[in-house]
Regions:
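Histidine/acidic-residue-rich, glycine-tolerant segments that coordinate divalent metal ions
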Residues: 127-137, 144, 161-282, 287-291, ...
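Acidic/His- and Gly-rich active-site-bordering loop/insert found
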Residues: 34-137, 147-164
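Bacterial N-terminal signal peptides that target proteins for export
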Residues: 1-16
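Bacterial N-terminal signal peptides
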Residues: 14-26
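Divalent metal-coordination and catalytic microenvironments
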Residues: 60, 99, 112, 142, ...
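Metal-dependent amide/peptide-bond hydrolase catalytic core
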Residues: 34, 83, 256-448
Length: 448
């Protein structure tokens, strides 16, 4: 916990950053696309570097590293960026790497963010480049994210004479969450000033998505991904013999009622058109079959796509918990932890960028999708500056389905890698060429 002085100092620093950004003149909106010569240069460079980029992706897949432990991954990234002539900063937020590509022409700075960490999953794919690390796997596609960002850096560094501004490549650790007791991820990168020096005016990211076919991308304007909060509940009853339940207070029965009634928040307490998920994912209680349990512990997650709704959830949950426990004569302890806000793709920024995306990939390959209830800490960047995250299709064309994210069988089609690079290059160049970015708009301020 910060001291009062340290907290005040941090708040002043953030206020200065906010004022510095918002006092800059808003960049003019444009819906232009790149000229033919620049488009051809991107394609030539993509063809030239494609095999090396795929090689990097496979190396990363074979050598996954967990959150805040991405040591070798960071070394590889830093060495590649340095070889390209970028200004490289290592050890950001622990293992993070930041590469700054300065264009030859004056202009604003935009960023490309990629996450680096893997998951504690044993890979079950029979691939020549499957994970070599027992119990660790790139099952969420961060190996693709990293290789795509590196590929984008390769191409744009060769086109720096065309860059009307700068590109900051942010390679982030711990998107999946830092280990208990540690800081990490987007929050720590922002805290350490990754959006400063030079000030970043807009930021891009992508995430692989197995529901979409390789060669396509998916986008949503406005709220794109959900908030993510956790809750912890301990119900305290009174133990008794299983044959004499009237002498105890059954914590398991009470927990069952709580679990059931929490779902009435979604179905009865809130506007049914609002997307809300309340999931109890863990329950522990009891010691043997003939003893009334005196304690049950519950843990779960809450997801929303609306900031106002998110604010209401803890109170609605505790009202149900309190009422039921009192009616049983039990007690409880309830802890609600806010984790991530919803991820907001600013609509004006998205609309300004869509022509470039469609020009790069083709009109019918840029698909509007529904918001999803998964969460991403890229949302923290999107709270600060205009942001655009989109889905990159990785399902093999012709296949009706693919293994989902976080599956031991997750196997994205590598043909998506050049698609992601092409999309990122067009977005970044379009943002700098036509200065299609926005002054800072906080989604939170729009909700209040």
């Amino acid at each position: 916990m910060q001291s009062g002085f340290a907290f005040l100092k941090a708040r002043i620093k953030h206020l200065v950053i906010f004022i510095s950004i918002t006092m800059l003149p808003p960049l003019a909106l444009s819906q232009s696309t790149l000229n033919q010569s620049l488009t051809e240069s991107i394609e030539q460079l993509l063809a030239k570097n494609r095999s090396e980029i795929i090689k990097i992706r496979r190396y990363l897949h074979m050598n996954p590293e967990l959150s805040n432990r991405e040591y070798e991954t960071a070394k590889l990234i830093a060495s590649k960026l340095e070889a390209l002539g970028l200004e490289v900063k290592k050890g950001v937020a622990g293992t993070g790497v930041v590469g700054l590509l300065r264009g030859n022409l004056p202009g604003p700075t935009v960023a490309v963010r990629a996450d680096m960490d893997a998951l504690p999953i044993q890979e079950l794919n029979n691939l020549p480049y499957r994970s070599l690390v027992p119990g660790v796997m790139h099952a969420c596609g961060h190996d693709l994210h990293t290789s795509i960002a590196l590929g984008t850096a390769m191409i744009l560094s060769s086109l720096k004479s065309n860059l009307k501004g700068n590109v900051k490549f942010i390679f982030q650790p711990a998107e999946e969450g830092p280990p208990p007791g540690e800081e990490g991820g987007a929050a720590l990168m922002i805290k350490e000033g990754v959006l400063e020096n030079p000030l970043v005016r807009a930021i891009f990211a992508l995430h692989v998505w197995p529901e979409l076919e390789a060669g396509t991308v998916g986008f949503a304007s406005g709220y794109f991904l959900a908030s993510s909060d956790n809750f912890y509940l301990t119900i305290k009853g009174r133990s008794a013999h299983g044959a004499r339940p009237h002498e105890g207070i059954d914590a398991i029965l009470l927990a069952a009622e709580v679990i059931t009634n929490l779902q009435t928040i979604v179905s009865r307490a809130l506007d049914p058109t609002e997307a809300v998920v309340i999931t109890v994912g863990k329950i522990q209680g009891g010691v043997r079959s003939n003893i009334i349990a005196d304690t049950v512990q519950l843990e779960g997650t809450v997801r929303t796509l609306n900031g106002r709704i998110r604010e209401q959830i803890p109170g609605l949950m505790e009202r149900i918990i309190k009422g039921l426990t009192q009616s049983y004569g039990a007690t409880y302890e309830f802890k609600y932890e806010r984790q991530l806000p919803p991820l907001y793709n600013h609509p004006d920024f998205v609309q300004a960028m869509l022509p470039a995306l469609r020009s790069a990939l083709g009109e019918n390959r840029v698909i509007e999708v529904k918001p999803q209830m998964v969460a991403e800490d890229f949302a923290l960047f999107a709270e600060k500056i205009p942001a655009f995250m989109f889905f990159l299709g990785v399902r093999t064309p012709g296949q009706p389905s693919a293994a989902p994210l976080h599956s031991p069988y997750f196997n994205p089609d590598e043909r998506a890698v050049p698609v992601g690079i092409r999309a990122m290059c067009h977005l970044v160049l379009n943002a700098l060429e036509h200065q299609a970015a926005l002054k800072t708009v906080s989604p939170t301020s729009e909700l209040k």
